[in-house]
């Protein structure tokens, strides 16, 4: 039980990383604005 402590804490990348935060803080508004602009193309006054 001395070196078996590392099994529950893998060295692989976790889900919530700084890269995940950066991708989603940039990507979610980008997709939202792209969808809004694309929807505005079909609105004719």
Curated annotation (Swiss-Prot):
GO terms for biological process: photosynthetic electron transport chain. Its main location: membrane. Pfam families: Cytochrom_B559. Its cofactor is heme b. It is found in: Cellular thylakoid membrane. It comes from the Bacteria. Belongs to the PsbE/PsbF family. The gene is psbF. The chain crosses the membrane at residues 20-36. This is Cytochrome b559 subunit beta. With its partner (PsbE) binds heme. PSII binds additional chlorophylls, carotenoids and specific lipids. NCBIfam families: cyt_b559_beta (TIGR01333). One of its GO terms (cellular component) is photosystem II reaction center. HAMAP family: PSII_PsbF. Heme binds at residue 24. Heterodimer of an alpha subunit and a beta subunit. PSII is composed of 1 copy each of membrane proteins PsbA, PsbB, PsbC, PsbD, PsbE, PsbF, PsbH, PsbI, PsbJ, PsbK, PsbL, PsbM, PsbT, PsbX, PsbY, PsbZ, Psb30/Ycf12, peripheral proteins PsbO, CyanoQ (PsbQ), PsbU, PsbV and a large number of cofactors. It forms dimeric complexes.
């Amino acid at each position: 039980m001395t070196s078996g402590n590392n099994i529950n804490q893998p060295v692989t990348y976790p889900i919530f990383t700084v890269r995940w935060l950066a991708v989603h803080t940039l990507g979610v508004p980008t997709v939202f604005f792209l969808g809004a602009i694309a929807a505005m193309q079909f609105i004719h006054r």
